[in-house]
């Protein structure tokens, strides 16, 4: 599972290696093809604002955006990964400045918020959405379950 993290935000008070490990954990847990590739980009607030306006037609910055490589992609786990071509899942774009504000409001650290947002973005790449109430309940339940499993596996608590 290849996870590439590119920090273009200028924010450095989080662990990029841990963020990549979380992304791998989520993809493994969701049984995504082990040859899959994911990019996680962290950008400045101005860049996130531009992306949000351009791709979502919404003003202002947002916390996370997910750009699937292939809209028709169906994530799969293969018993013979060597038979599957490498799957480019897409990009998860995070904004640490927005994450920091949200973390303060939620009462936890920015790194925890980045973990929440990264997990959320990956779920969007895997086809989950929250446009309808039932979808939202399903996605949030799965997101919380994945994060709780990560906390246990990584030996961290929600912080």
Swiss-Prot record:
Intracellular or extracellular location(s): Cytoplasm
Principal cellular location given in the protein's record: cytoplasm
EC number: 3.1.-.-
Residues that hold Zn(2+) according to the record: 120, 124, 130
Entry GO terms, CC: cytoplasm
Cofactor dependency: Zn(2+)
Enzyme type, top EC level: hydrolase
Pfam families membership: YbeY (PF02130)
Domain of life: Bacteria
CC cofactor note: Binds 1 zinc ion.
Keywords: Cytoplasm, Endonuclease, Hydrolase, Metal-binding, Nuclease, Ribosome biogenesis, rRNA processing, Zinc
GO biological process, one term: rRNA processing
Record GO terms (molecular function): metalloendopeptidase activity; RNA endonuclease activity; zinc ion binding
Record has Metal-binding as a keyword: yes
The keyword Thylakoid appears for this protein: no
The protein's role, per its UniProt record: Single strand-specific metallo-endoribonuclease involved in late-stage 70S ribosome quality control and in maturation of the 3' terminus of the 16S rRNA.
Family: Belongs to the endoribonuclease YbeY family.
This protein's name: Endoribonuclease YbeY
Organism: Parafrankia sp. (strain EAN1pec)
């Amino acid at each position: 599972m290849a996870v590439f993290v590119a920090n273009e935000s200028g924010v450095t008070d989080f662990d990029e290696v841990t963020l990549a490990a979380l992304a791998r954990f989520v993809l493994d847990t969701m049984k995504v093809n082990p040859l899959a590739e994911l990019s996680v980009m962290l950008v400045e607030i101005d860049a996130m604002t531009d992306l949000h306006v351009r791709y979502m037609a919404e003003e202002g910055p947002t916390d996370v955006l997910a750009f699937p490589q292939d809209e028709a992609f169906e994530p799969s786990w293969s018993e013979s990964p060597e038979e599957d071509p490498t799957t480019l899942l897409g990009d998860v774009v995070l904004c640490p400045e927005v994450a920091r504000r949200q973390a303060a409001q939620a009462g936890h650290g920015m790194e925890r918020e980045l973990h929440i947002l990264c997990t959320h973005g990956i779920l969007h790449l895997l086809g989950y959405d929250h446009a309808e109430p039932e979808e939202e309940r399903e996605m949030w339940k799965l997101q919380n379950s994945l994060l709780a499993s990560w906390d246990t596996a990584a030996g961290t608590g929600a912080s």
